[in-house]
């Protein structure tokens, strides 16, 4: 029996989504033994705020050690939250498969009487670790107190039970994958808050080259083409901006009636300025749509906002 070692971070969410991937792969390859290996990353060990890391321009915060394990042949497939994966892979690696995306939206969880973002009282304390969410909140509701909140899902939910936070904002996908959908009070629609590029999707990364064709074939068995088109548009937009996964950038692509619509957002960290635009086209031209939108927004001054977030 062939053995395939699947690498992942060791958080509750990372393990939940990796077990989901392995279950899908096992359905396609019942004669293969899949083994999960957990790997600690810099993001797991570093307690700095993501805002501080963004200012340093760090990339691969959550994935580098896992990619190193791939290159060193200690694992065969890596499972990542796609929003954490830089837009360029190291030489010798490739994204072999993107499974079907779950909900891309952000969600709000609040204390009694604080269940909707628009209804939060003036001065309410909202916790999030995301640079993008902080920039959005400061622009959308400058009257709110935006407070840093890092940690896994359980840690963040426990923090909400204390006195420091009135509400927190998380990715819907994490709560859905860890079977905590019932904790969600409000789904924040993309027309209000655009998610991170690739949010809600997973990436299966492998070594590239013909000697790895069989492993690539194993991973590709659960690839979803519709998700791939949407993700490609979002990530080409991010790449065209020259921004990383910790920049104050949002993007969301949808396909309806054979037309792909990509919305993009870039904001100042202090909420003083936002740029938002849309590009549409044939899903087959998803990469060009993303690049076109990036060019449009750079022409509107997006670069200055991205650069300021690094200072």
From Swiss-Prot:
* Record's cofactor remark: Binds 1 dipyrromethane group covalently.
Q: What class of enzyme is it?
A: transferase
One Gene Ontology term of the biological-process aspect is: protoporphyrinogen IX biosynthetic process
Pathway membership: Porphyrin-containing compound metabolism; protoporphyrin-IX biosynthesis; coproporphyrinogen-III from 5-aminolevulinate: step 2/4
Q: Which residues carry this modification: S-(dipyrrolylmethanemethyl)cysteine?
A: 245
EC number from the UniProt entry: 2.5.1.61
Q: InterPro entries per the record?
A: HemC, Porphobilin_deaminase_cofac_BS, Porphobilin_deaminase_N, Porphobilinogen_deaminase_C, Porphobilinogen_deaminase_C_sf
Highest taxon of the lineage:
Bacteria
GO molecular function terms listed in the Swiss-Prot or TrEMBL record: hydroxymethylbilane synthase activity
Keyword Nucleotidyltransferase appears in the UniProt entry: no
List the cofactors.
dipyrromethane
Task: Tell me the keywords, alphabetical order.
Answer: Porphyrin biosynthesis, Transferase
Catalysed reactions listed for this entry: 4 porphobilinogen + H2O = hydroxymethylbilane + 4 NH4(+)
A cellular-component GO term for this protein: cytoplasm
What is annotated about its quaternary structure and interactions?
Monomer.
NCBIfam families under this entry? hemC
Family the entry assigns? Belongs to the HMBS family.
Stated role: Tetrapolymerization of the monopyrrole PBG into the hydroxymethylbilane pre-uroporphyrinogen in several discrete steps.
Q: Which PANTHER family match?
A: PORPHOBILINOGEN DEAMINASE
Add the further remark from the entry.
The porphobilinogen subunits are added to the dipyrromethane group.
Q: What is this protein called?
A: Porphobilinogen deaminase
Could you tell me the gene encoding this protein?
Answer: hemC
């Amino acid at each position: 029996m062939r053995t395939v070692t699947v690498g992942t971070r060791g958080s509750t969410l990372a393990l939940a989504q990796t077990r989901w991937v392995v279950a899908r792969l096992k359905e396609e390859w019942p004669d293969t033994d899949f083994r999960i290996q957990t790997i600690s990353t810099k993001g797991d060990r570093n307690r700095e705020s993501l805002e501080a890391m963004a200012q340093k321009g760090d990339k691969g915060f959550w994935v580098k050690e896992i990619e190193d394990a791939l290159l060193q042949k200690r694992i065969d497939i890596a499972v990542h939250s796609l929003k954490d994966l830089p837009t360029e892979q190291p030489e010798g690696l490739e994204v072999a498969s993107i499974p079907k995306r779950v909900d891309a939206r952000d969600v709000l969880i609040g204390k009694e009487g604080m269940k909707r973002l628009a209804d939060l009282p003036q001065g309410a304390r909202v916790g999030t670790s995301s640079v993008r969410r902080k920039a959005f909140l400061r622009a959308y509701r400058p009257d709110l107190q935006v407070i840093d909140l890092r940690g896994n899902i359980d840690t963040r939910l426990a923090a909400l039970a204390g006195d420091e936070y009135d509400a927190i904002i998380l990715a819907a996908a994490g709560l859905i994958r860890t079977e905590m959908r019932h904790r969600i009070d409000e789904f924040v629609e993309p027309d209000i808050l655009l998610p991170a590029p690739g949010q809600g999707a997973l990436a299966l990364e492998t070594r590239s080259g013909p000697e790895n064709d069989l492993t690539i074939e194993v991973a590709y068995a659960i690839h979803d083409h519709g998700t791939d088109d949407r993700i490609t548009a979002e990530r080409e937009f991010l790449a065209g901006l020259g921004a990383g996964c910790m920049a104050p950038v949002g993007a969301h692509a949808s396909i309806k009636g054979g037309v792909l619509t990509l919305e993009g957002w870039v904001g100042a960290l202090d909420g003083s300025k936002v740029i938002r635009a849309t590009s549409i086209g044939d899903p087959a031209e998803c990469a060009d749509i993303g690049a076109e939108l990036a060019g449009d927004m750079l022409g509107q001054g997006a670069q200055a906002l991205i650069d300021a977030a690094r200072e």
